Curated annotation (Swiss-Prot):
ATP binds at K630. A motif ('HIGH' region) lies at residues 79-89. HAMAP family: Leu_tRNA_synth_B. This is Leucine--tRNA ligase. Residues 1-31 are annotated as: Disordered. Pfam families: Anticodon_1, tRNA-synt_1, tRNA-synt_1_2, tRNA-synt_1g. NCBIfam families: leuS_bact. It is an enzyme of class 6 (ligase). It comes from Renibacterium salmoninarum (strain ATCC 33209 / DSM 20767 / JCM 11484 / NBRC 15589 / NCIMB 2235).
Length: 862
């Protein structure tokens, strides 16, 4: 049985993406499990109904943008409108909201915008299923989500709202494509691409997860197509080197993932002459270049391998071996890159009938086509050194190829053990390199290759150019026209946007392997802008990751009509001070956005060189230890949670359950506990009797000290994103304030008003409806979101008293305010004199008393 987590300090532990939500309901909370009698009519439904329309009318989160305050920009990864908001959204968006509200209270001019990533395949599939146009489903969902955003009290500037499927947005997506095209960064080429046989569209390398389509899970195949690419590889070094600016501000896990994806490695290009073959263009001896990080092991190369799906394999194969190669290619074409590189998989290959000549010793190396070699790594060909590479060794043993050890690592002979000798060692069987260690041998080998003109030092990258083309409808059309006379012709800027036709719907959008746009003759057939002759539009649409690579720039000036964004506005706001979103976007979206900003910087459109100064990855919302899903039947409906417990209780639970980066298991939290705590906090304001504006300096010093310590610690904790600890400390302040009202300094003491105002300000970050009502009850005329974070009096931070916990047999029975310098004997005496302790003991004797002055006493009865 899973035990619900209550709201004790012990429950503060180390919080996203949930799943599933039914259609939005705008009903207020109807079943809040709060003891209404005890908490004096805390009615969260009425409170929500009171404040939501007032907030909407005031648009209190629109920035001034007049230079009167220092600017801060907080941005959430915008949602895809696939339905209503779900539990994952609830956790993710509250994190950015906490940051934005806090910065506003601290006096910054805060930009916190909202929008939708509204192009994409789900809308197209929904339109096919519903016999509709994708826009109908998309914009209906956007309106539903927008209503939920407002109800959920996310403090954003609604005047900056955008959707990437709006023509006035994708006009600028197309405009940016053309600027990349002019710079040589957008180009088209024929190449093997990842192909999803279910969605019938191509996928970027980053969209293939463990050999399957990231969206539908179908195993991905390879297909030769003429496709559009962005030349992101031109920026590989800058993308890698500029990560130094992000150290300490981005999660190290994300930086490591990007470093690995870019995959920079130092080594050498080595030229191998193909025996008996001439270059078709030059007539000279045919050469094939390979990349290796270990040129020092050249003497150990015993065969040459080419990727089975590389064009090079078809070029090198002899006519006698061509049929065998074709049959092999057919057998392996359905294997993913991941499967092909699995270490425990049987190695397969075909001899191509030719030999490559080792440039360092003239040895003839048989050339094989192999599926463990990838076409898009290096040049698609490798020199195989089986003694010192396990996959090469497995292949050599499978086809009875020689194994020659050239590195003495102290390990047994790989030819006998079947285990490659890897790592550092001393070169052997390597001619003039004998006796050299790896660090000396690598540059020596490169020097030798350079002298004989067959190699040079180089850098290789795992990163490949970004595949942009999609053979689907619901995306921005590629703004290129194809003319038989002029070739590729960019659509003139004054003809942008190239709008999507509005007459396609339902089955007309069904995937056929070519874009549905190709079927609309009056859209496809146009005059060439250059020569006026008959021409056709490009029928592919642009990868939706392009839309999301620059939306945060559009937020800075969404009404700007002279470009994708106003350069002056972007200069004022960029880069984003706090970006919030899931770690699943570490490579795709985040890497692409970094690439875009660097190109725009080079184009002179943007001063920023990085899009996001700081990144916060929230965790996942689980249920019963598993991700929520329809198949598991463990989904939690967000709207039902909001109706039952109230918005504030759900928000507070999300924040209190764990630090933002950790997962939240909804089966193990207590939104009802959150609601009860909020009712207690709300009740405080009903009991304050001092007038607004009273000088708190005349109030109870002990309570004031707790209030100011809470404010001081909360500020540091919020900066560190330890929101759950802030909530815990606010709970302590509420409890201490209640005790002060009931049995301490009393409700009229100015320190009580100060404490309750502090509670309202802090709670406005997490539970804005309740905080707003507390603030108004205290007599304030303006919204609490427009208040200021209270100034901390440092003189009150020096503790003269502390709360000592008194336990009886390990259970807390009383709390005592005691001097910080109290002795153990004094604390023991006070604890034993407590009326609550005496009542608990009920005449029993005492076995022992454990004292840890000034914080703890534990009494063990006899």
């Amino acid at each position: 049985m899973v035990q619900s987590r209550g709201f004790s300090l012990s429950s503060v532990r180390n919080g996203t993406e949930g799943n599933t939500m039914s259609q939005h309901t705008s009903q207020p909370a109807a079943d809040v499990p709060v003891d209404v009698a005890d908490e004096n009519r805390y009615d969260i439904a009425a409170i929500e109904a009171k404040w939501l329309p007032r907030w909407e009318e005031a648009n209190i989160f629109a920035p001034l943008d007049d230079g009167s305050k220092e600017r801060r920009y907080v941005c959430d990864m915008f949602p895809y409108p696939s339905g209503d908001l779900h539990m994952g959204h609830a956790e993710a968006f509250v994190m950015g909201d906490v940051v934005g509200r806090y910065w506003k209270l601290k006096g910054f001019d805060v930009l916190h915008p909202v929008g939708w990533d509204s192009f994409g395949l789900p809308a197209e599939n929904a339109a096919i299923k519903r016999n509709a146009h994708p826009a109908e489903w998309t914009y209906a969902n956007i309106e539903t989500q927008a209503a939920s955003f407002k109800r959920y009290a996310i403090g954003v500037d609604w005047s900056r709202r955008l959707q990437t499927s709006d023509p006035e947005y994708y006009r600028w997506t197309q405009w940016l494509f053309l600027r990349f095209y002019e710079r040589g960064l957008a180009y088209r080429k024929n190449s093997p691409v990842n192909w999803c046989p279910k969605d019938l569209t191509v996928l970027a390398n980053e969209q293939v997860i463990n050999g399957a389509c990231e969206r539908c899970g179908t195993p991905v195949t390879k297909k030769n197509l003429n496709q559009w690419y962005f030349k992101i590889t031109d920026y590989a070094d800058r993308l890698l080197d500029d990560m130094a600016q992000l150290e300490g501000h981005w999660p190290e896990r994300v930086l490591a993932m990007q470093r690995n994806w870019i995959g920079r490695s130092q080594g050498a290009h080595v030229d191998f002459v193909i025996d008996g073959m001439s270059d078709a263009e030059t007539g000279e001896a045919k050469k094939v270049t390979v990349f290796t990080t270990r040129p020092d092991t050249l003497y150990g190369a015993t065969f040459f391998a080419v990727a089975v799906d590389a064009a090079l394999a078809d070029e090198l194969v002899t006519e006698e071996q061509r049929a065998e190669l074709s049959a092999y290619q057919e057998r392996v074409k359905h294997l993913s890159d991941i499967e092909r590189q699995e270490s425990d998989r049987e190695k397969t290959g075909v001899f191509l009938g030719r030999y490559a000549i080792n440039p360092i010793d003239g040895e003839m190396l048989p050339i094989w086509a192999a599926d463990y070699v990838l076409a898009d790594y290096g040049t698609g060909a490798i020199m195989a050194v089986p003694a010192h590479d396990q996959r090469d060794l497995d292949f050599a043993r499978a086809f009875d190829l020689p194994v020659r050890q050239v590195l003495d690592t102290g390990a047994e002979n790989p030819a006998e053990t079947g285990t490659a000798a890897i790592g550092d060692g001393v070169l052997v069987n390597s001619g003039e390199l004998d006796g050299l260690a790896k660090a000396e041998a690598i540059p020596a080998a490169i020097s030798l290759l350079s002298k004989i003109g067959t190699g040079e030092a180089t850098t290789n990258y795992r990163l490949r150019d970004w595949l942009l083309s999609r053979q689907r409808f619901w995306g921005a059309p590629v703004p290129i026209i194809h003319c038989a006379e002029c070739g590729e012709v960019p659509v003139p800027d004054d003809q942008l946007p190239v709008r999507l036709p509005e007459n396609l719907r339902g089955e007309q959008l069904a995937p056929k392997g070519t874009s549905p746009l190709a079927s609309v003759a009056d859209w496809v057939n146009v005059d060439c802008p250059k020569c006026g002759g008959a021409a056709t539009r490009d029928t592919d649409t642009i990868d939706t990751f392009v839309d999301s690579s620059w939306y945060y720039l559009r937020y800075t000036s969404p009404e700007y009509t002279d470009g994708p964004f106003d350069p002056a506005a972007a200069t004022r706001w960029m880069g984003v001070d706090q970006y919030v979103g899931g770690v699943e976007h570490a490579i795709l979206h985040l890497l692409y956005s970094r690439f875009f900003v660097k190109v725009l910087n080079d184009l002179g459109l943007l001063e920023a060189k990085e899009p996001f100064k700081a990144l916060l990855n929230q965790g996942q919302v689980l249920n019963g230890g598993k991700a929520m899903s329809k198949s598991l039947g463990n989904g939690v409906d967000l709207s039902q949670q909001l109706d039952r417990f109230g918005v504030d209780a759900v928000r507070l639970t999300m924040v209190f359950a764990s630090p933002p980066e950790d997962d939240v298991d909804w089966a193990d939290v207590s939104p009802s506990g959150s609601a009860k705590f909020l009712a207690r906090a709300w009740r405080l304001a009903q009991d304050v009797t001092s007038e607004i504006g009273v000088d708190p300096a005349t109030g109870d010093r002990a309570l004031r000290s707790v209030t100011h310590r809470t404010l001081s610690e909360a500020a540091d904790l919020i900066d560190a994103h330890k929101f759950n600890v802030v909530v815990a400390k606010t709970m302590e302040l509420v409890n201490i304030t209640r005790k002060s009202i009931d049995s301490g300094c009393g409700p009229a003491d100015p320190a009580v008003r100060e404490a309750v105002e502090a509670v309202a300000v802090i709670l406005s970050l997490f539970a804005p409806y309740t905080a707003e009502d507390i603030w108004a009850e205290l007599g304030h005329q303006d919204f609490v979101a427009r208040a200021s974070w209270p100034t901390v009096d440092d003189s009150l931070l020096v503790q003269s008293t502390i709360t000592a916990v008194v336990q009886v047999q390990g259970k807390v029975r009383d709390r005592l305010e005691v001097p910080t310098d109290i002795t153990e004997d004094q604390l023991r005496e006070l604890a034993l004199a407590s009326e609550i302790v005496q009542k608990t003991l009920d005449g029993r004797g005492i076995r022992t008393v454990i004292v840890r002055a000034p914080k703890l006493v534990n009494i063990v009865p006899a």
